[in-house]
């Protein structure tokens, strides 16, 4: 006979923290250099002029200006550019 009561164990009970992905600055909005435009997994959006690509595929502004989203090329790639606004 068992001297301890058998205790079942659940294989659930885990959850990952939210990653807060998505577009942070939308088309037509003003942005400063260094600000994040899109947080993404993989390149759903590709960097255009004035936009850098981070190690985790984050798109960020390299210059001050306005954000512009467009679809380019035969592959219909969605690109993000920052157009500098002349004062």
Curated annotation (Swiss-Prot):
Gene3D superfamilies: 2.40.50.100
Coiled-coil regions listed: none
Superkingdom field: Bacteria
Biological source species: Stenotrophomonas maltophilia (strain R551-3)
Protein name: Large ribosomal subunit protein bL27
HAMAP family found in the cross-reference section: Ribosomal_bL27
Single Gene Ontology MF annotation: structural constituent of ribosome
Family named by the database record: Belongs to the bacterial ribosomal protein bL27 family.
One of the protein's GO biological processes: translation
A Pfam family recorded for this sequence: Ribosomal_L27
Keywords per UniProt: Ribonucleoprotein, Ribosomal protein
Lineage, highest ranks first: Bacteria, Pseudomonadati, Pseudomonadota, Gammaproteobacteria, Lysobacterales
GO cellular component terms, A-Z: cytosolic large ribosomal subunit
Key word Transmembrane helix present: no
Alphabetical list of InterPro entries matching this protein: Ribosomal_bL27, Ribosomal_bL27_CS
């Amino acid at each position: 006979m068992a001297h301890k009561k058998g205790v079942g164990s659940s294989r659930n009970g885990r959850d990952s923290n939210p990653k807060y992905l998505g577009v942070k600055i939308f088309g037509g909005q003003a942005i400063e250099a260094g600000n994040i435009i899109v947080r993404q997994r993989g390149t759903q959006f590709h960097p255009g002029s004035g936009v850098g690509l981070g190690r985790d595929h984050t798109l960020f502004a390299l210059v001050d200006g306005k954000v512009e989203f467009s679809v380019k090329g035969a592959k219909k790639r969605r690109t993000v550019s920052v157009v500098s606004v002349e004062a």
